[in-house]
Amino acid sequence: MKDILLEAGFPLQFSEEAIEESLRIPTTITEKEIKTRRDLRGTCTFTIDPLDAKDFDDALSFQLLPSGQYEIGIHIADVSHYIEEGETLDQESYTRGTSVYLPDRVNPMLPENISNVLCSLRPLEDKLTFSVIVEITPNGKILSKWIGKTIIH
């Protein structure tokens, strides 16, 4: 499997500079940052991933509103909050373009402490996300939609 990645030009290792840069990223979410986002930490949010997954990069939420309508949320990890444009991590992730999932391994687009920890939408942790929130009728008619920065738990 490693040969497939090498033949496709996919780097197997991150540069030392990229690893060091990833370790310097602050892990605390500030109150200032929370105030700039729609707070969905009180909404039941869940991922749908294999049991052995570590990089939970997307999540869903669903709730019945008092009006009888439904609210559906689609949430994706806000990696852009942590990766500065033009920096080494940005350049290396651009070169990779994606994480590659093979039967025996995952070669991530970003170092594991970002993909599996900082930006992984793990249970019982506050995480920064981009979300699409859609309100629909029981018949599926879209009543409203909202797209923006959020924080989920």
PLM regions and their residue ranges:
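Charge-lined substrate channels and their catalytic hotspots, especially those that engage the 3′ end
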Residues: 1-73, 80-125
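Beta-strand residues in well-ordered beta-sheet regions across diverse protein folds
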Residues: 73-75, 145
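Polynucleotide-recognition surfaces of large bacterial nucleic-acid defense/processing enzymes
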Residues: 127-153
